[in-house]
Design a protein with these regions (language model features):
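Structured all-alpha helical bundle cores of eukaryotic regulatory proteins
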Residues: 128-152
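Sequence/fold signature of self-assembling virion shell proteins
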Residues: 2-10, 143-182, 189-194, 200-302
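Assembly/oligomerization interface modules of large self-assembling protein complexes
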Residues: 25-83
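Solvent-exposed alpha-helices and their adjacent loops that cap or buttress functional pockets
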Residues: 79, 187-189
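N-terminal alpha-helical "arm" segments
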Residues: 1-27
Length: 302
């Protein structure tokens, strides 16, 4: 149904001072600080696990060389979705409004709505990171204690015992990252890159990462996390995280958390020939998810 003059009665008469409630300052883009962003020109994108070789065994004199083989494993698929919205407004509502460019203002609101959906869908990857109903290519949720290794065994990117964000829990997750292995169970030099938290943990994160001495103690010990430069002070607050206790550490694993832009923000405007109504629409096409779960470690909190 088209918006009409009855939708904006106060805009048809003198005496109105201001409009409020539609436009506020917005937080900077958050999803691109958590997900590595790529463009796409295909109907979907796929990443497939590839493995190398295990440790080379000792070869005895005159004996044949041992043989090994690499192989492909599971596949992660990114299926693009289209999000969009439209509105219509009558000619008369546009002509008789005394105070604002209604079409332009609501067109900005459309773009904001699409932006919100992008942020929410991206944040939901983390919101569902501990939920076994949402699995990746290896059949496990994003954060799990038993991700399968292709040649046998498992690895964990979740604290075995859920814990709130603290000095000890952060150190435990850094140790897990430091001892990470690939699918042939070979050590990999994985490094913490960014602490990702909900708004409720921003002050605790500042104390943990920026204090010169150990936070929350009377001892004269150094803050080992800061002194060693394990992660620096790079913190990303994700406004749309729904669990106030959950926290995450993004690593530098390649091909991990990914966002594919198939079609960037598109705006359209037309006029309905029969009614004269102005028609506005906006759309975006994208996908978001993960390939290698080693890109994220964390805990759901206690």
């Amino acid at each position: 149904m088209a918006m009409n003059r009855a939708s904006f009665p106060k805009d048809l008469e003198e005496g109105l001072n201001a409009h409020f409630g539609m436009e506020y300052r917005e937080y900077p883009e958050e999803y691109s600080k958590v997900f590595d962003t790529f463009s796409s020109d295909k109907a979907w994108e796929e990443d497939v696990l590839m493995t190398g070789f295990g440790p080379a065994p000792i070869k005895g004199e005159g004996e044949a060389f041992a043989e090994d083989e690499g192989r492909q494993g599971w596949t992660a698929r990114y299926n693009h979705v289209t999000v969009g919205m439209k509105f219509a407004i009558t000619q008369e509502a546009l002509e008789d409004n005394l105070y604002m460019q209604v079409g332009a203002r609501y067109a900005r609101a459309l773009a904001r709505s699409v932006k919100e959906t992008v942020e929410v869908m991206s944040a939901n990857i983390l919101n569902r990171a501990f939920n076994a109903s949402y699995t990746g290519g290896d059949g496990k949720e994003l954060l799990a204690t038993n991700h399968p290794l292709l040649f046998g065994g498992t690895f964990s990117n979740e604290l075995a015992t859920p814990a709130d964000l603290s000095e000890s829990s952060l150190e435990d997750i850094f140790i897990q990252i430091r001892t990470a292995v690939d699918d042939r169970n070979l050590p990999i030099a994985l490094k913490p890159k960014r602490l990702v938290i909900p708004p409720q943990l921003v002050y605790e994160a500042a104390r943990l990462l920026r204090s010169v001495q150990r936070p929350g103690t009377d001892y004269n010990d150094i803050n080992a996390i800061k002194a060693l430069g394990v992660i620096g002070e790079d913190v990303q607050v994700v406004t749309r995280l729904t669990d106030s206790d959950a926290w995450f550490v993004k690593t530098d694993a390649m091909d991990g958390l990914k966002f594919f832009d198939r079609v960037g923000l598109q705006r359209g405007m037309d006029e309905d020939f029969n009614t004269g109504n102005a028609l506005y629409k906006v759309r975006r096409r994208f996908s978001v998810g993960w390939s290698d779960p080693r890109a994220l470690y964390g805990s759901a909190g206690s």
